[in-house]
């Protein structure tokens, strides 16, 4: 199946992982760019068009009054054929004050990398932003994904693969549990850690909050099947989709691993 956002040169993305620092504090503060895709099929809008005006309105709105408590927003503006749909999702430990800087950076980055594209996605370390002329609420995006992995291998690859996959699967069940709530809202996020031999693995999974819990699990189940291609024996790895993602490392990269949902203390 061909992707509407073009082919992904996955191996080229591995180098990006090497550029990211392993410092917990710096990871928490950075909005490191990871990847982007510009739509090849949705076309481009003209300067001064109704689509551009709708897009500008939505983007200015989400950066000023976005739902930063929950780290997510899906909104639309305009009428067909000038409908604009915009979604952002911040990483599960990057809500509240940590979310706005990443979204602002993503808006600027998307405008620069995909100028006048009606459809585009951009991923940063702590958030993703998607614009489209096509509605996608509660629909799993199976087309647009990529992965990053550490080039170094574990010595006991078989055991490491088995135990890391088991941890990620456990987190997928937790994230998509209908009882995993923040108030009345599904969390759709989980993080945890596990000792494997002499090493400790830190991991997280997350879905965008437009999905219902069953679709969240379906999405995570799908990207976890990509573990062999992405992460076979690797000391760290991530698979990113538009609708869900997972990550594991041999160092802590989140602020907290004790709770499925992590809030800033203010």
Curated annotation (Swiss-Prot):
Compartments (UniProt record): Secreted
Keywords for the protein's UniProt record, in alphabetical order: Repeat, Secreted, Signal
Keyword tRNA-binding belongs to the record: no
GO cellular component, one term: extracellular region
Domain Gnk2-homologous: 33-136, 142-253
Signal peptide: 1-26
PANTHER family named in the record: CYSTEINE-RICH REPEAT SECRETORY PROTEIN 29-RELATED, CYSTEINE-RICH REPEAT SECRETORY PROTEIN 38-RELATED
Protein family per UniProt: Belongs to the cysteine-rich repeat secretory protein family.
Protein name: Cysteine-rich repeat secretory protein 41
Organism annotation: Arabidopsis thaliana (Mouse-ear cress)
């Amino acid at each position: 199946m061909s992707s509407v956002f073009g082919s992904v040169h996955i191996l080229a993305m591995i180098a990006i992982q090497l550029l990211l620092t392993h410092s917990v504090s710096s990871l928490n503060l950075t909005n490191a760019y990871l990847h982007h895709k510009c739509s090849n099929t949705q076309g481009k809008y003209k300067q001064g068009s109704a689509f551009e005006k709708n897009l500008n309105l939505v983007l200015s709105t989400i950066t000023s009054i976005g739902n930063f408590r929950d780290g997510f927003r899906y909104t639309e503006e305009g009428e067909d054929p000038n409908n604009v749909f915009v979604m952002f999702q911040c990483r599960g430990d990057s809500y509240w004050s940590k979310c706005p800087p990443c979204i602002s950076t993503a808006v600027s980055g998307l405008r620069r990398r995909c100028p006048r594209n009606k459809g585009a996605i951009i991923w940063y370390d702590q958030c993703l932003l998607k614009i489209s002329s096509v509605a996608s609420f509660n629909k799993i995006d199976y087309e647009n994904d990529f992965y990053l992995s550490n080039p170094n291998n574990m010595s006991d690859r078989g055991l490491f693969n088995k135990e890391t996959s088991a941890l990620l699967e456990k987190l997928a069940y937790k994230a998509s549990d209908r009882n995993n709530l923040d108030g009345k809202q599904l969390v759709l996020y989980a993080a945890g850690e596990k000792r494997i031999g002499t090493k400790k693995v830190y991991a997280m999974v997350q879905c965008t909050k437009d999905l219902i819990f069953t679709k969240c699990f379906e999405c995570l189940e799908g990207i976890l099947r990509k573990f062999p291609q992405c992460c076979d024996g690797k000391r760290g790895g991530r698979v990113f989709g538009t609708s869900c993602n997972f990550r594991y490392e041999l160092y802590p990269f989140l602020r907290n691993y004790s709770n499925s949902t992590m809030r800033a203390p203010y």
